[in-house]
Each structure stands twice: as structure tokens, then as C-alpha cells.
């Protein structure tokens, strides 16, 4: 017995795999969307149902509202209907969707009309779309209908147009999550004609409907809303396709408007102007703020917050990018977003001002690359500092030029005009002021050069004897030396103050960026979304999260976004290491400065935390699955030991009785003991057969040969096998089985079908010992339905699906009633043959098991 038990445990090795991997594939949701009642949504749904029925799909109708329309009711003919469930409320009975009946029937496709319907109080779920979610979770495809006025996000707009508040609403995300949304469109004039002909409402309601809700203006507005809403969904699908296929070329499939803001007083005007431009072409509006990487041109958080609130209220999205050259950063972002129009602010500038600084707008227009640029003027923009808009390279060159030009200009003015009015002290003060100006512009080094040049010019042109490098008076020498020393000292102080100001602004901007990225994580963004935000902010071609495990020669790509991403550290333009070098954030694009790397190091740490958090969640899920598998394995071992112990004990008692010499058994007693032994062996044989079949199913080695199988022959062979005791020991119950399958033929594997029927009939005989078991069959379109019906105790409602789980038997509350693999094996065999099997209540009591198999293409 020990060896047999070990062998059986070995047989169940594949069960761990099966338990961990058995999942139910979620059904698909298809929605017919309409602008108003009567456009033909239900009619289109029924037409799709007939097309699927012609292809051999198992389609049933659970809820179809015909509203008294004859054409719709006629189209419902030929479709199996699941009766509604009636709910009593305030003395009346209301029909509702019977979710449990749908789950018991378990068709491939079910029709559920009016997805936004509110269920009668007392129902399990308050809304019908929640019922549909349960059906989808069971792996059943649902086809439904929705009117645009029922979308919760558009409810107030529809009420404003029609003057009618819609009580029944459905969240927008439910409809957006549908696998397919098809618009059923009809012109307002055609819909009004249909209404006038009585094809929508009864005759007594037509006049009121035409003069109220179904006015031409209302229908036109609702139609436009429906078309625009669906266009948004198509656009989202297109963006997903472009991202999946890594397409970067601009597709002007839709207008997109980008507006650049600084956070200053002109920003709100720019956003409103861009919103008007976008609304005229129904374009998407994006607001972008460029953060200067050098820390200049900072803006306060409250100012930028007001711009963000305005953008959100206008339906725009807010974006932040980093770049030292603002026009380049704007154009890169616009191209990345596939924008067609760019709105920038500009100020009125004099000719002299344009000579030194063209302005961001003018520089942006020079290289738009196919993007239409709108330059909007605003009085407040003229007060902005032009120096802060200069790039670091331009500012560096300008400061060194100022170090040469400012002392020269001061010297020329002093020699030509001021020398006659001022002494050496006043002239030194002028040069001192010039050095301070250079220090403010460029820092210590240009200021030192300016101080040196100032001293030389002061000595040569303004100190006696003039036009020589000789200093005759000691006071003049001291004055020049003090000038140089004080100029350099003050330049150091000024440069330090300016540096601290820039650092403070840079720190504020870094904090703003960190808050931006941290906010994405807190809002539940996944790793790919975070990397996309990094790529967008720093104008990178691609961003990759790489993991280099200890001892590995190559890295593992955890996630990547963009085109042509880096796959190793050496090929990256910018590489950010995290912690112990296990994670790297790799960037392909422009090389980032050290100041940007500080922020990215913190972001990369957040990204690594997301990876580890995801891994911990997966490990927790695996641990839970293993725990469930261990629990099921313990249940299996307990059940197997019970099923083995009972027949072995009976056989042992019978053999011991026959071998005893103390009692002389009559021939009848001997025959009975031998029958007990045979019956026990039959039970063991059936148990081992089911175990082996389950093991084969778990290993995926079942390869059915589908041919024409005559059900009369299959049922008779199953009854013979039961009578011989191959799968059970209720030989005396064979006469209780009534067969009425006629000449039905199914496409099946004859051997597997015999095993399925034998298991189901044997199960019915076991649990309905005093009742008739009926087996009947019939063809329904392109399917053959086989019913095994008993009138026994049945099972509690809602637990029918549990019968097909491994180790489950009717009425099980513990693991002491047996293995219960027969029904599980039956489902595995049926599904291997491309069919389905389900259980439902027998009217009057009992259990009915329905096998659904394909029918041959030609009728015999």
C-alpha cells in the first residue's frame, strides 16, 4: 500500500503546474454607441448576433429591449433567450438580467441591451454594467448598447443641450475599456422620419418626442458629441499603435496645439488664446513650461500653479521640459508630441533690442519644421528681462566682450569729455563701476580682466605723465592698486551672491521636477509611464531601465520607452547608476549636464523602487499560489487516502474471510465475497484511471481525433463500461438510465466522448440513487447539445461551477468524501474536443449537465 500511495503521488506531480496556471480568460465587451434612442443600436446588436450564429458561435440573449418595434422583435427570432429574473419592489415585479442563469448557461456570447440601466432596488448590483463585469470575468463575451447621453462625463453637456437630466449614467472608463466600440450613426432628419413613422415610439408619444428631445438641433448636437467622443477613442488607439510599432514620423491625423508658458502674467493670456485656436479645429491642447537647466529665469511655484489650474480647467494637459536653449526645447517637444501648431508669446522690441536679442518667438519661427507658429503679443511680456533669455554660451561670450568693451568705453568718454571736470579719484570710481557691471554679467574672471584693463587704461590715458606707463605720483599708484583690489574683491562678492541666487533657483527647479516625478508615482504611474515622463522632460530619444545582476556579463532590460533604446551602459549617451550598480537608467539623446544628473539620480532611485515593488508583488502572488497548491495537494492526499482505504479495507476483509478455516462459507456467501473483492478492485481501477487522465490533461498530452461520433453508440458503450464496473460499481442502477438521443451526430473523439458520458452517468447514478437518469441530445443550429439529467438532491445555487474543479464532489464540505475527479476530467476532455460543459438546475429538483459540441457540416 505504501508503494501504491507513492506512485499515486508521483502521478499528481503535474497538478502543481495546473493549479498555478489555470486562469479564466476574460470575455470581450463590444458596445454599439448611439447619439439618441432609435438610431438602431439594438437592431445592429441583433444583426451581429445572427452573423455569429451563422459562424457557429453559441449566442444567447439575456436582455433585449424591443420597445414594441416590430422589426427588432422579428430579428430576435431564432436567438435563444435566457428568461429574466424578476425583482419585487413596492408591490410590483420588474424583470432584470439573470446573471446566475447566464453563468450557468455559459454561452460564448450573450446579448445585454442598455448597459447604463439602473437595476431595481434589491438587486445584487445597483447598475447593469456591474452585472456585465461579472459575466466578462467568467470568460463570456458581451455585446451591449449605450447612448451618448448616458456617459457620466458628458451628462452635464447633454443636459445643457436637451434640458433633460439623465438619471441613468455609466462611467466613461467602462465604455473606454471596451474591446470594440462601434458607432451606429444616422442623420437627424432620418431619425425624425423614423420616429414619425412609428418605428421608435408608440403613436401617442411621437408628437411630444418630435417637439422636445428629438428636435433637429438637439439631435445634431448629440450626433456631434458622439462623433467627437469616438474620434478621441480612435486617436488613443492610433497613439497606442504608433507606440507599439515605434513609429516616430509625424502623422497629421489630428490637430494638436502646443502653447509655451513662462508662468508670468502673460501666460494666462497665451493659454486662453491657444485654447480658442484649439477649439476652432477641435484640436488637443498641451501647455509646456521649459525649465532652464542653468537656474536662470526662474518662476515662483504659485504663478506656475495658477497656470496649471487654468490649463486643467480648459481641458489641456500640462507638461514640463528641461533645456538651456528654450526655442530648441520647445520645437523638440512639439515634434515629439506630433503637434501641428505652436503658440509662443513675444514682446514689442526696438530695433536696437532686436539687434542684440531677437527673442524666443523670432528664433522659434526660424526652424519650425512644418509646425505652424503663432506669435502672440502681450504688454506684460515686454517687462521680462532679456538677459535671462540668453543661453549660457551667449552669456559667456558677452561677458568677456563686456570685460574689454566697458573699460574702453569709459576711458573714451572720460578722455573726451569728463577729464576736464574730474580728478583721478572720480575717474577711478567710474572704472570701478564698470568692473562691477562686468562682475554682475559674467562673474569673477571677466571682472578681473576688466579690472586689469581698467587699471592699464587709467594709468596710460589719465595718470601723469600721460601716454606712458610711468606713474610719477605715489598717490596715483596707490589709487590704481586700491581700484584693482577693491574691484576684484567686490566682483568676488557679487559673483558669489549671483551664484547663490542661481543655485537657489536651480534647487527650486530641481524640487519642482522631483515633485513632478514623485507625483506621477503617487498617482499610481507604472515604470513605463515614469520613464516616458523622463524622456519627455529631458527631450531624450529613448530611456531604458537596465538591471545588471551580480555576476552577469550583460544587463537585463526591465523597461524602455522611445526609439532605438540603449541596451548597455557603454552605448548610452547618459547613464545614471542607482545604489550598488544593480540598476542603471540609460538615455539616448543629448548628453545631460551634471546638474540634471542630480535630479535623475533621485528619479532613477524611484524607478528602481518601482521595479522592486513589482517584483515583491509578484513574489507575494507566487507564494500565495504555492500556498493554494499545497493546500490542494493536502486535500488531494487526504481524499486519495480515503478512496483507497475504503475499497482496500473491503477487499482485505473479504479475502481474510475466504482464507479463514474456522468458517465454512456456502457457495452464495463465497460468491458475494468475491463480488465484494471485484467491486473494490473496480473502484481502485476507476480511481487510478481518473488520476491518470487528470495527469494527462495537466501535462497537455491529450490529442483528440475529431470525427463523426454517433451519440447512440457512445452512450451505449458508456453504459456497458459502467455495467462492467470499469468506472463504477452501481451495476444495479443501469436500468434507471433512459436514453433518447435519436440519430444525433457530433464532431468528437469517440473514445473521449465515451469516457465523458460514463463519468457523468456514473456521477448521476451515485448521487441520485433512487431516481431516473435521462440522457437526451439534439442539434441546435451548428451545435449538438447533450443533456445528462437526474432528479436527485442537486447542488446549491451558485456552486455549479465548483463541480468541475479538481477534488470536488457534490455536497463537499471537507476532504473526506473522495477525490471527485470525474467531473474535472469530463470538462478537460470536452474542452480538448473544442466544446463546453456546464451544469444547471433540473426543473423540479436535481442536476442537469449540458455538453455542447460542434455538429458536422452536413446533416446525415
Swiss-Prot record:
Entry keyword Glycosyltransferase: no
Post-translational modification: Autophosphorylated.
InterPro entries in UniProt: HATPase_C_sf, His_kinase_dom, HisK_dim/P_dom, HisK_dim/P_sf, Histidine_kinase_KdpD, KdpD_sf, KdpD_TM, P-loop_NTPase
Location within or outside the cell: Cell membrane
Classification via CDD domains: HATPase, HisKA, USP_KdpD-like
Keywords: ATP-binding, Cell membrane, Kinase, Membrane, Nucleotide-binding, Phosphoprotein, Transferase, Transmembrane, Transmembrane helix, Two-component regulatory system
UniProt EC number: 2.7.13.3
Phenotype reported upon loss of the gene: Cells lacking KdpD and KdpE show an increase in virulence in mouse model of infection, with significantly shorter survival times.
UniProt keyword Kinase, yes or no: yes
Cofactor: Mg(2+)
Membrane topology: Multi-pass membrane protein
A matching Pfam family: HATPase_c
TM region positions: 397-417, 429-449, 477-497, 511-531
Top-tier EC class: transferase
SMART domains noted in UniProt: HATPase_c, HisKA
Protein induction: Induced at low K(+) concentrations (in M.tuberculosis); overexpression of LprF or LprJ increases expression of this gene at 0 and 250 uM K(+) (in M.smegmatis).
Cytoplasmic-side segments: 1-396, 450-476, 532-860
Modified residues (Phosphohistidine): 642
Topological domains, Extracellular: 418-428, 498-510
Oligomer status and interactors: May interact with lipoproteins LprF and LprJ.
Stated family: In the central section; belongs to the universal stress protein A family.
Protein name: Sensor protein KdpD
Taxonomic source organism: Mycobacterium tuberculosis (strain ATCC 25618 / H37Rv)
